[in-house]
Amino acid sequence: IIFTTPHNKNMMDTFIVEDYLKFLKMISIYTDFYDFTGYNTITTENINYYESSHYRENVGKLIAARIFNDKSVEVPEDFGVLVTKDNIDEHLENLRKQIKEYDLNKVLE
């Protein structure tokens, strides 16, 4: 099982977005994977992280619940997407939209 780590918003803010999205596209050519990146209810809350790249145990439990479809754990709807070669383009567009909305909200604050 392959998945992307859910980087904290502060780490995501440093990414060269289009390069990162190309990386995700390349992964999808070879295998399906779960993507936990982006700006979502988990990655935008600093409490879920020790610092910008290391998430806390509760986040790990959410990742496992999403991957193994554990209905006993309430996983936020916006956290974790199974990405395939068939849905990668739609997923990348959704990430671009998330990033633009997050950036706009930062400016408006």
Predicted regions and their residues:
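Compositional signal for N-terminal targeting/processing segments
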Residues: 15-26, 53-54, 61, 65, ...
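Alpha-helix initiation/capping motif
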Residues: 8, 43-45, 84
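Generic structural motif recognizing short loop/turn segments at the entrances and edges of beta-strands
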Residues: 29-32, 45-46, 79
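C-terminal soluble interaction/assembly domains
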Residues: 20-23, 34-37, 42-43, 48-55, ...
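Conserved, well-ordered alpha-helix/loop/beta-strand core segments that scaffold catalytic motifs
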Residues: 1-32
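Residues that form generic nucleotide/phosphate-binding pockets
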Residues: 26, 66, 94, 98
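Charge-patterned, long linear interaction tracts outside catalytic cores
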Residues: 90-109
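Histidine-centered active-site loop/cap adjacent to the catalytic His
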Residues: 48-93
